[in-house]
Amino acid sequence: MAGGHRLLLENARQVVLVCARGERFLTRDALRSLEVLEGASLVVGTDGFIKAIGPADAIQKQFSEETFEERIDCSGKCILPGLVDAHTHPVWAGERVHEFAMKLAGATYMDIHQAGGGINFTVERTRQASEEELYSSFQQRLGCMMRAGTTLVECKSGYGLNLETELKMLRVIERARQELDIGISATYCGAHSVPKGKTASEAADDIIKNHLPRLKELGRNGEIHVDNIDVFCEKDVFDLDSTRRILQSGKDIGLQINFHGDELHPMKAAELGVELGAQAISHLEEVSDEGIAAMASARCSAVLLPTTAYMLRLKQPRARKMLDEGVIVALGSDFNPNAYCFSMPMVMHLACVNMRMSMPEALAAATINAAYALGKSHTQGSLEVGKQGDLIIINSPRWEHLIYQFGGHHELIDYVIAKGKVIYKK
């Protein structure tokens, strides 16, 4: 019996499925060659989920009596899953372009931080900004990410450090989640820095006694939806004990643990994350061998951020060792005032050049594995029947051009589609 569907993508040169057997993540040998169909078509239903993928002639025959709200001829082009950005700080006021000049002159991240710059500078301006001002700039930033192919993005609070401003940021994120087409995973990051006038232990007490109970209440009322809890576990910021207390308290109210660890100093944050059952740990430039082995065994995702290592001139995360040992490696842009990058294609390119990842490894890390880091790989991160119709169409006969063409994604990306709806067309 004939029926209606939302979208038919016809005659693509390549359809990059990434996965084809319902995998929730890819490691080791599964990353050597991703699942790719040649000369294929794809159907998205009116519910926004993929209904069929296969050879173009077979799809044409199967759906010859069906109607579609939209058809797109993909001849000579490639269809890929929408990209997933597993780590961003996109809600803030007060740019820090002046600090870039300081870094170029030799100042370190912690030099700037201890001089009252860095996070502290942004916190002051974010506290002063209205909710509407924050939403306006956030919406523009999400638009830039979406035009670069991102269809699911993790969004952190963390430039408030007091309950009032953290909730203001989370309301901004919730509004975007409700109103915009891009997918959002919301993260409470009230432990991004220790507020002036408090010790790490005092800040942790405030978060545990005041912030988290309020988040639980607002979540129960349906006012704010938060998925993850984050802490900046670092020397002279939050030590292991404070980090453990905050993360465990967040887990106790149902939040996934997804935190900053082992970035500037070896803290044994990876080992702590595994102990607490973390879904993901980000940065990991200074992770220990034991931490890598523990993360691999626990299926705890490593969210690597090549932009940060590049811009701060840090040593690169040991992606190659993590991949070889079976860690679930994901990628994020770390978009923030200190690492101003919207583009996951650029992140993938940097991962390949600076972290020695292959192009299939980088694409998996920016799709299925990034979705896994956010607890979303059952619905997003690959092109499979039953998953959300989140995808991009690039004007190239080979998918690798999305990574190969450094900085050229605006010329490549013809369409960005979320749940079968075209949200960007060049």
UniProtKB/Swiss-Prot annotation:
EC code(s) of this entry: 3.5.2.7
InterPro entries with a match to the protein in the record: Amidohydro-rel (IPR006680), HutI (IPR005920), Metal-dep_hydrolase_composite (IPR011059), Metal_Hydrolase (IPR032466)
Reactions accelerated catalytically: 4-imidazolone-5-propanoate + H2O = N-formimidoyl-L-glutamate
Root EC class: hydrolase
Binding locations of N-formimidoyl-L-glutamate: 159, 336
GO cellular component: cytoplasm
Cofactor: Zn(2+); Fe(3+)
Binding residues annotated for 4-imidazolone-5-propanoate, in chain numbering: 159, 192, 263
Keyword Zinc applies: yes
One GO biological process term: L-histidine catabolic process to glutamate and formate
CDD domains: Imidazolone-5PH
Positions contributing to Zn(2+) binding: 260, 334
Pfam family, one: Amidohydro_1
Top-level taxonomic group: Eukaryota
Co-factor: note: Binds 1 zinc or iron ion per subunit.
Residues the record lists as binding Fe(3+): 260, 334
SUPFAM superfamilies: Composite domain of metallo-dependent hydrolases (SSF51338), Metallo-dependent hydrolases (SSF51556)
Pathway(s) this gene product operates in, as recorded in its UniProt entry: Amino-acid degradation; L-histidine degradation into L-glutamate; N-formimidoyl-L-glutamate from L-histidine: step 3/3
PANTHER family (UniProt xref): IMIDAZOLONEPROPIONASE (PTHR42752), IMIDAZOLONEPROPIONASE-RELATED (PTHR42752:SF1)
Identification of the protein by name: Probable imidazolonepropionase
Organism: Bos taurus
